[in-house]
Amino acid sequence: MSSVNKNELEKFEKISHSWWNKDGEFGILHRINPIRLNYIIEKIKSHYNDISDLEILDVGCGGGLIATNLTMQGFNVTAIDALQSNIDTALAYATENNIKVNYLKSTIEELENDKQYDVVICLEVIEHVENVQEFMLNLVKRIKPKGIAIISTINRTKKAYLLGIIAAEYILGWVPKNTHDYSKFLKPSEIYEMLENTNIEIEELKGLVYNMAEDKWVLSDDDIDVNYFVYLKKNVLGVI
């Protein structure tokens, strides 16, 4: 069963050339990218004593904002996306800047072989796919035993609707209108339910909050009402 939502692909294909334009449609991702990157690296370093040979899978990599920066930090990254135009943009940037990322046009379910990775990353993707539970299970199957995953998405709350859609899309113009569908936002409890009866443990939920007074994004232990990270670990024994 495919995780691809054709309407979502068409929407992102129209702006796929803009991934590396900090003032363009993906400008907000450039603003939060440093804090996303730092969070990912912090979790990797806290989990693994030796990070020299780790293999990372970036699912739904877009134009390569995270994959590029992780590669520049010395990690071995495979990055996949369902849109060829996203992969083309990512490859063009990597080639121009002599950065070696293994980019592949693929969905998580189409990814060849049964290879597993030390770290699986999926940022701001799950709220754009079809068949979310199957997508999630395919995602965690790609984690090695004792490996980790970091996912980010948007909570389905009134606050998220007001800030993530009304404010971000229609008032502030941080992202294009109709980028998000409120019905596809995910509550943390729904992610817990998807992973029941598996060998996956949710270790941490961490909010990503805009501090209006200081005009910056910060991590929060308490506020997961809008944007949040899910940090997962995979046990040795279990179903997945």
Curated annotation (Swiss-Prot):
Residues given in the record as S-adenosyl-L-methionine binding sites: R36, G60, D81, L123
Alphabetical GO biological process terms: methylation
E.C. number(s) listed in UniProt: 2.1.1.222, 2.1.1.64
GO MF annotation, one: 2-polyprenyl-6-hydroxyphenol methylase activity
Keyword Transferase: yes
CDD domains per the UniProt record, alphabetical: AdoMet_MTases
Catalyses which reaction(s): a 3-demethylubiquinol + S-adenosyl-L-methionine = a ubiquinol + S-adenosyl-L-homocysteine + H(+); a 3-(all-trans-polyprenyl)benzene-1,2-diol + S-adenosyl-L-methionine = a 2-methoxy-6-(all-trans-polyprenyl)phenol + S-adenosyl-L-homocysteine + H(+)
Taxonomic superkingdom: Bacteria
Enzyme class: transferase
Keyword Ribonucleoprotein applies: no
Listed InterPro entries: SAM-dependent_MTases_sf, UbiG_MeTrfase
Keywords per UniProt: Methyltransferase, S-adenosyl-L-methionine, Transferase, Ubiquinone biosynthesis
Pathway: Cofactor biosynthesis; ubiquinone biosynthesis
Matches recorded under PANTHER family: METHYLTRANSFERASE (PTHR43464), UBIQUINONE BIOSYNTHESIS O-METHYLTRANSFERASE, MITOCHONDRIAL (PTHR43464:SF19)
NCBIfam families linked to this entry: UbiG
Function: O-methyltransferase that catalyzes the 2 O-methylation steps in the ubiquinone biosynthetic pathway.
Family: Belongs to the methyltransferase superfamily. UbiG/COQ3 family.
Name the record gives this protein: Ubiquinone biosynthesis O-methyltransferase
Organism: Rickettsia bellii (strain OSU 85-389)
Gene: ubiG
